[in-house]
Amino acid sequence: MAIITGREIKDGELIILGVGLSMLAGYFAQFNHAPNLRPFTEGGVYGSTPVGGLPWGIECNRISANATSFTNAIDALGFLVLSGRADNAVIGAAQVDKYGNVNTTGIWDEPPWKTGRYTPPKVRLNGSGGASDISVGCKRYLIMASHEKRRFKERVDYISSVGYLTGGDSREKCEFIGGGPAAIISTLGILRPDPQTKEFYLEAYYPFTTIDEVKENTEWDLKISPDVKMVPEPTKKELKNLRAVDTTGSLRKKG
């Protein structure tokens, strides 16, 4: 999943990365095909190449040691992201719906949109962190998620980070600076938003799965591209560069 996400990242992009799989995908791209990538973190560490293994935090010494600059979250999120300067980002999702809205706030028996009032969730999650700012400010962003029916929802319990809201032009009406999610890269395949409806459809699936399995693990009626294809397997070069970032294999089993 990290390699497939990394393939979506272009050389020269100004990209904000979070901890874990987000950094793995981003720095993999830098090592593999995007040497001029301009990565930065929510903590304000800009222009670094990781040393000593996968970074464990947004300000850790593995990225701060050779950074071009070291500022703060206000500069990262307030200046680079919410001004519309950031080209791309990678965020995670506990739940994602058919319009790319992401929930990382909590899980409810009866979600607030159904009851009409906010009540404490049954399960409290970590929250959006900088992903809420990213979702409204970045020119585009990528969502990484484990593909399970309980996660790929018809409608998320709570919108922590906005996608295309209710579809169509509903996002444009809010006049956000950013352009919205460009893709959902899951553990089963790649989903893209329809240009008109903004509903996510299946563009490609992995060699080890099937279209039926992807549909069975999606709560909404997932549409399939007429040109649906199989995702090419990682090359030897890609695997080598992935392991050059995550030298200890700390996240290898997760993506």
Across the structure, where does each feature detected by a protein language model lie?
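N-terminal active-site beta-alpha-beta segment that forms phosphate/nucleotide-binding
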Residues: 1-67
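Short secondary-structure junctions and interdomain/linker hinges
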Residues: 8, 12, 16, 221-225, ...
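Residues that form generic nucleotide/phosphate-binding pockets
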Residues: 8, 217, 241, 245
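Short amphipathic alpha-helical patches
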Residues: 28-32, 52-53, 104, 109, ...
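Short, intrinsically disordered/low-complexity patches at protein termini
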Residues: 34, 40-41, 224, 246-249
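Feature targets compositionally biased, intrinsically disordered low-complexity regions
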Residues: 43, 51-52, 83, 248, ...
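Conserved phosphate- and dinucleotide-binding cores of soluble alpha/beta proteins
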Residues: 53-225, 229-230, 234
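Acidic/aromatic/glycine-rich contiguous surface patches that form carbohydrate-binding/processing clefts
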Residues: 227-255
